[in-house]
Amino acid sequence: MVHGTAVLKSEYDGLGLSVLWVVPNEGTKGVVQISHGMSENKERYLPFMEYLAERGYICVIHDHRGHGGSVHNREELGYLYGGKNKAMVEDLHQITIWIKEIFPDLPVYLLGHSMGTLVARNYLKYFDNELEKLILTGPPCENPAVDLGLLIARTQKRHRGGRYRSKLLETIIFGTFASRFAGEKSRFAWICSDEEVVKAYEESPLCGFTFTADGFEGLLMLLKETYRKEGWRLQNPQLPILFLGGEEDPCIGNGRKFVKELQYMRQVGYRHVTGKLYPGMRHEILNEKDKLTVYRNIYQYLEK
């Protein structure tokens, strides 16, 4: 397989978007575009990308703005450059168009994780006709406190500036996640049951950073727009959509809330929405101890 990288200039504001891809040596079946989660970087998905590439799928991922290589400097990790939710969605779509220009005859599948599912679902409102299938892992559930969070983010942004790192919002949003695993060593224990994965995440300068007020505003706008019933163009109601999560993932809430996420997409008008929860797994099911089971399930879904 062949690995490659590039930097594309965002059509939204000119920010450099760092892109990584893996291409099979032969027999390409399609392209899997990946939309990663909050406070992480694209390279964490390489094992999964290589697994799919070995089975005939090209994989492409870019660092969302404010992440990995899509920043002017590392001091701006967690800063969205004032682009809010709109820029992240437009960036994702720009990468899709770029993929289609290079591989015009191949179907494009989109996989989003965590915050990346919010970007993907916002994208879906406008561009569902670009995709063959959509897969969502660790999808955040609806949160009734989203407006309060937005008020805090905007107040902090106004008084302290967009680059101010909001420990308050970090605690409000993620404090309860950590408290579910309070007996474990790391405050990031909620992301994965594999301590080595958590340790690597904690030690990486590209992971676990606190979002800025500007970043939290964008994140919360993504969350709010995901669950706003207005604005869905529904150009492709036949699009197959698969929700996947870990039963012990506090981000999806619980089994009942997970089912509500599926039901919501059906209410919007999508006719082929399915889901699966994995016992014993936490937030990052692609990094869990039994991740190969998840890899296989995703591969089988792509092959259907």
Language-model features and meaning:
Residues 120-206:
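Alpha/beta-hydrolase-fold enzymes
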Residues 103-114:
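Alpha/beta-hydrolase fold nucleophile elbow
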Residues 32, 36-40, 114, 247-248:
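Active-site glycine-rich loops that stabilize anionic/oxyanionic intermediates
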Residues 1-26:
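N-terminal cap/lid segment of alpha/beta-hydrolase-fold proteins
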